[in-house]
Each structure stands twice: as C-alpha cells, then as structure tokens.
C-alpha cells in the first residue's frame, strides 16, 4: 500500500507562474476563446430574443417602480427613493463604452464582473444590483442582467417625473469578464501616469482619464479643483463616447439633477472592493466602518454634494443654482475638493434627517459648465429653456444607454422609439424584389465574366465586411458603405483600385434590378473564392443570403464612421504606420473584434494571402507560386525548413537555406504563424498532406461568417 504523502497540498489548477509571467509579450490568443459555450450555463439552444418576447414587460416595470421607494434597512434609500442610485448604476453600466474600438458599454452585463464591479468609480453600485436581485430572480432568463440594469435606470428616471425617450431590450448576458478590453496600463487605482502624452493627450483607445473611473476626476485634473482645466478632460472623455458639447452638458446636468454624492467620512473607513472582500461578504464590497456604514454615514466617492432642492424629482434646479449663486472651494468631510454656494440659504434637504437643510453644493466638474465659454452658452440656453434641456437629456440618455447595441433591427420591446437617429447607422427599407436561385446563378456568371480578378473580388468583399466590430455591433457589409465617405477613401482599401472594382460591380447591380450593391459585393467575393477553390481542385459553393440594402451618404455619419478605419488589418497585411504595439498583437485585436476564433483567424490569413487580398497589392506573405488559387501554400512554405528568415528594412526576407537566394518577403504577422507555438500547431493542420480539402472548407466557413456578421435578420 502506498505511503500517504505528508506534504501539504499547496497548488491548485491555474496556480503557479504562468506562461504570461514568463513571456509578457506572448500573443493573447485566449482572448479569441472568450464567451464560448463552455462558460454559458444556458446552452447553445437558448434564444434570448425569444425569451424576451415572453416577458411581461409592463409587469416588470411595475415591480421596478415599486422597488424605487421600498427602502431596505441594510441599505436605506437616500431621500426615501432609490431612483438616483439606480440612474448611477445604469449610467456606469453603459458609460464604459468608447468609440475607438467599440468595446465597453452596457451591452453584455459586464458591470457584474471584474474589474468593473470593483472599480473605485463604481463604489457601492454592488448594493444597487443586490436590491434588484429579487426582481431578476422573479423574471429569470426572460430579462438579462444587461437589459435589467439599463431598464432600471429608465424606470428610475420615470419614477422621478422625467419622460424618457424610450427603451430597447436585446442585450444578451455573457458569463465571464471581457478580458479583451484594454482599460490602461496603470497598476494603481485612480492613477493617470500611463495614459497621457504631450499636453494631456489621452491615449487611444482609452476614454476615462483615470484607471478605475468611468469619466473624469470630479475634483478636476489631478484633484486640482480647477473647473476650467477640467473642460479638456471632459471633452476628451465624453467625446470618446461619441458625445458632443450639447450632449455633454445635458448628461452632466441631467444626471446631477438627482440624488447626492457620498463622503460622510475619510475613505480610510471603506473596506476592500468586492473582488478583494472576504468570502463571507458574498460579493459585496466597500463595507464601511464609519457609524452605521450606510444612510447618513455612507462613504462612496468621498464627495458630499447634493445639487437640487428636489433630489428625487426632475427639475431645472441644477442650472438655477449653477448661475444664481457664487461658489467657493470647500472640502467634504472626507477631505475632497468641492464647492459650496456663498452666502446662500440652506435650501437643500438632507438625505436622511427629516427637516434638516443644507447649502447648495457642486462638483468642480459641474462648475465647468459655467466657466468654459462654450459649455456656458449651452447651459444658459438650457437655463432659459427647461423643455429644451429635458429633451436634450432624454435623447442623450437614450444614446448613452443604447450606443453599443448596433442597428435598430436588434432592438426589442414595446418602447422602442420610432424616430430614426443618425448614430444608429440607419439603413433604408428593402424595396427590391427578392432574387431567386436562378437570379443568383445568373449574376454569379456575369461576375465571373466581368474581367475582375479573384484578388479584386475577394479584397473588395473583405474591405466591406471586415469593418464589423463585435463590441458595438457597428460596421459590416450591409449598407454598402464601402462606396461612401469615409470608407471609399481609406488607405487600407486602396481607393483607386476600389473605385474601378465598384464601378464594374455597380454596372452589374443596376442591370440586374434585383440586387443591392451590398449583396453584389458579397456575392462577388464568394465568386472569387469559388473560382480559387475550383482552381485548387476543390468544388464548393460559398453560401449566400441576399437581403442586404444600400445606405445613403445622408445616413452615414462621416465623423463617426471614421473610428472604424483600420489602423492595422493583418488579414490584408495592412499597417498604417509604426506604433508601440507589435502588429501581430493588432491582428489578434482585429480578429477579436470580428468575433473569430484562433483557427478561423488562421485559415483566413492563410487564404487571403494566397488569394492576393493584401492592401495595395503587397507581396508580403504571398507564399505561393499560384496566386489566386485557394491552396494552403502559405502554411506549407512558411513551415518549410529549407527557408531561413532574416529582418530587412522593416520586413523579413525568406531565403533558401542552401543557396541564399531570396524566395519570399513577410511581415511580423506572417511569421507569427510559424513563431507562436499555438499558431504553428494550427498552421501544421493545413500544411499537412491531407490539408487541402479541409483548408478550403474551413476557409469558406470562416469567410461566410465574416460576410454575415451584421446580418441580424438571419438570426
């Protein structure tokens, strides 16, 4: 009998020094495996849109309305009303969105998970979600957490006398953190030392000015108490959420019409955040040692500010007070910089002591709306036009909470607004007769006879579809915005060549009378793939689903769509210029935005190289003597040990190991598939002697996925 070990068991799965610890620059390919079926308890057959249709929507709203004034002893409601804290919860769920990469936002219920559930700016929002649990429990999977967080904010506003613009459901929960989101490089909460360059220029794609903040420091830059200096940070942060000056003013003032900030005592009284709290805290954090730890003793932001005389009712008090009083810099009980109205009467109600009144108070960033000349103009207009302010806030709130949901076709529920908004990237209704199989076959034959090459057909379809971003559901082939500004002029799309291809395809489209140009572009790409597969000896039909429409220039916000321009697209071996991030990492970033797995990314890169889809006709990575033929030659030749690689003039030269004769040139992206152990393992599958047929079928499957990423009508 084996002797029982006397050694303690000190190791668990996943513990110890990781590969990432040893090699910090290693490709993060695990980011392409996020949110797989293995992490989803609801199973592959679960259809959230169908479940949402079964929801008694107005009964849910009634329950939420009742919750607003059902104060609980364990977390008493300020002013007897939970509305303000639920507005903050919804705001902070949606407010992580940024335009640069479409990541963040409230569309996946990420506020439940680290790091967001433990950000300093989200202090005590964990209590709001716990207050919601009985309602979530009651309605189960017919309402996602992602939808519930936003809907609760809407109901909170309505319960306080505000008329919202509407609400759309359709946000499907995920079950683990979005580890692909880069929140910054700082390792200390509220730090700023690694996100600015030059004259306080915030690095892309970041939007928040501090690690762990949703927006900006409410005490001003570096807690300076300078409201004018705060204007730059405010514009940068809100601007990266696609908000203009009017929307910024409306959101700040509208949000601060309700509730209060909490700073009853120094922050040293706060316990650890949820992710750092002990097991017995059961996911709640920031337990306070000051007084009762809640109610009048609450410590959250460290600021102790109440803006209006009716903190649980919509009013125009914010602007009335902003301009009526003169303000002096003071400190909260926690020592934070804030502003108190000079010589003002005590007109502000205390949140928990009946009859007690306080002087009006403001944040440094509130006063920015008065001292910044452009913000002041808007603020005075809203002061004189309360209805205009209410409408602006309603629209800005709807945009804030729906910006990451993608096109309107994804919206669910009885309160979806009828009005079409430019930021929704609207599409016209379909007006063409639906083509049948014979129509499709006829058009495919004409495309094949058009004189356009495989490379032209494939590159154009890829340029159209690959703008898609899985975060905010923007981009994609539907709309044929490839022919419109700004996309038609993007360097990655080789504008001169693109114009010629589009002209030919548009001629075929108009002659057909049954297809949108968006459909023709995708169909033409499929024709190119089929031709290339046939030349490789594999007969295959690329799936095609008509039904796309063509957007107009008027339906396309040029400034907003500019964020979709690729800085790098490793699938086309395109890189706009040198940067601090190795381009192979940017390939993974692009693949993650396209919701691709590592095998899908691999087969697409290998296929696009041999099909000649590189931007500008570059020959880098075209490891084949048969361009335009869908072979696994990219992988076969990359893994060939008869070739040796050396860096040369910003790229790499592949030379015959014996003769020294140059055979190929490559980028870092190309060589990653031989250098990275995981990618090499995938490449070996296609480079094997039996890899040809599998390669073609896998390429067509991944290609079709990308072409249909924005086809929510097919789901």
Curated annotation (Swiss-Prot):
Top-level taxon? Bacteria
Q: Which cysteines are joined by disulfide bonds?
A: none
Active-site residues from the entry? 92
Can the keyword Metal-binding be found in this entry's annotation?
Answer: yes
Cofactor(s) in the UniProt record:
heme b
Q: What are the residue positions of the site described as Transition state stabilizer?
A: 88
Check the UniProt entry and state the signal peptide residues, or none.
none
Query: What is the designated name of this protein?
Result: Catalase-peroxidase
* UniProt organism field: Methylibium petroleiphilum (strain ATCC BAA-1232 / LMG 22953 / PM1)
Gene assigned in the entry = katG
């Amino acid at each position: 009998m084996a002797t029982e070990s006397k050694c303690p068991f000190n190791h668990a799965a996943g513990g110890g020094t990781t590969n990432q610890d040893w090699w910090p620059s290693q490709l993060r390919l695990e980011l392409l495996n996020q949110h797989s079926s293995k992490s989803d308890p609801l199973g592959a057959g679960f259809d959230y849109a169908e479940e949402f249709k079964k929801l008694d929507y107005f009964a849910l709203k009634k329950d939420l309305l009742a919750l607003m004034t059902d104060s609980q002893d364990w977390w008493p409601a300020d002013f007897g009303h939970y509305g303000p804290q639920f507005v903050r919860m919804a705001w902070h769920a949606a407010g992580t969105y940024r335009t640069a990469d479409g990541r963040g936002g409230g569309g996946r219920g990420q506020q439940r998970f680290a790091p967001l559930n433990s950000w300093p700016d989200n202090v005590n929002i964990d209590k709001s979600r716990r207050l919601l649990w009985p309602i979530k429990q009651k309605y189960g999977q017919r309402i996602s957490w992602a939808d519930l967080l936003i809907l609760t904010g809407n109901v909170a506003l309505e319960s306080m006398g505000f008329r919202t613009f509407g609400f759309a459901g359709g946000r499907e929960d995920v079950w683990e953190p979005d580890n692909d989101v880069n929140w910054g490089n700082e390792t200390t909460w509220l730090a700023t030392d690694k996100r600015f360059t030059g004259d306080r220029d915030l690095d892309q794609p970041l939007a928040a000015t501090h690690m762990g903040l949703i927006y900006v420091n409410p005490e001003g830059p570096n807690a300076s108490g300078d409201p004018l200096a705060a204007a730059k940070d405010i514009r940068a942060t809100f601007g990266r959420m696609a908000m203009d000056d009017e929307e910024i003013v409306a959101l700040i003032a509208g949000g601060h019409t309700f509730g209060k900030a909490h700073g009853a005592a120094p922050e040293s009284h706060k316990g650890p955040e949820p992710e750092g709290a002990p097991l017995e805290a059961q996911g709640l954090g920031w337990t306070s040692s000051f007084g009762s730890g809640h109610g009048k003793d609450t410590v959250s932001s460290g600021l102790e500010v109440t803006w209006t005389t009716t903190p649980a009712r919509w009013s125009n008090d914010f602007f009335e007070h902003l301009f009526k009083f003169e303000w002096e810099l003071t400190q909260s009980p926690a020592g934070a910089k804030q502003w108190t109205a000079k010589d003002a009467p005590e007109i502000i109600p205390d949140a928990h002591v009946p009859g007690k009144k306080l002087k009006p108070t403001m944040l440094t960033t509130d006063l920015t709306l008065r001292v910044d000349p452009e913000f002041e103009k808007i603020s005075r207009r809203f002061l004189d036009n309360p209805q205009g302010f209410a409408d602006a806030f309603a629209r800005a709130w709807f945009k804030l909470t729906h910006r990451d949901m993608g096109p309107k076709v994804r919206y669910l529920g009885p309160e979806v607004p009828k009005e079409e908004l430019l930021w929704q990237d609207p599409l016209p209704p379909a007006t063409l007769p639906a083509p049948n199989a014979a129509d499709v076959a006829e058009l495919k034959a004409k495309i094949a006879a058009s004189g356009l090459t495989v490379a032209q057909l494939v590159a154009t379809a890829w340029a159209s579809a690959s703008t898609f971003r899985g975060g905010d559901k923007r981009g994609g082939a539907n709309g044929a915005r490839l022919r419109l500004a700004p996309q038609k002029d993007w360097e990655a799309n080789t504008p001169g060549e693109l114009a010629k291809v589009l002209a030919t395809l548009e001629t075929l489209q108009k002659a057909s009378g049954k297809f949108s140009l968006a459909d023709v572009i995708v169909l033409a790409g499929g024709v190119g793939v089929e031709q290339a597969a046939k030349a490789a000896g594999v007969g295959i039909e690329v799936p095609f689903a008509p039904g796309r429409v063509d957007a107009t220039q008027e339906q396309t916000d040029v400034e907003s769509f500019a964020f979709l321009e690729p800085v790098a697209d490793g699938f086309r071996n395109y890189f706009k210029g040198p940067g601090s991030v190795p381009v192979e990492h940017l390939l993974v970033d692009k693949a993650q935005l396209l919701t691709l797995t590592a095998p899908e990314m691999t087969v697409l890169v290998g296929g696009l190289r041999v099909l000649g889809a590189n931007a500008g006709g570059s020959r880098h990575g075209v490891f084949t003597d048969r361009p335009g033929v869908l072979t696994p030659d990219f992988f076969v030749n990359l893994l060939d040990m008869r070739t040796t690689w050396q860096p040369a003039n910003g790229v790499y030269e592949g030379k015959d190991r014996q003769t020294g004769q140059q055979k190929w040139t490559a980028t870092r992206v190309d060589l990653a598939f031989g250098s990275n152990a995981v990618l090499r393992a995938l490449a070996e599958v296609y480079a094997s002697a039996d890899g040809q047929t599998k390669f073609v079928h896998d390429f067509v499957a991944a290609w079709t996925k990308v072409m249909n990423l924005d086809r929510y009508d097919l789901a």
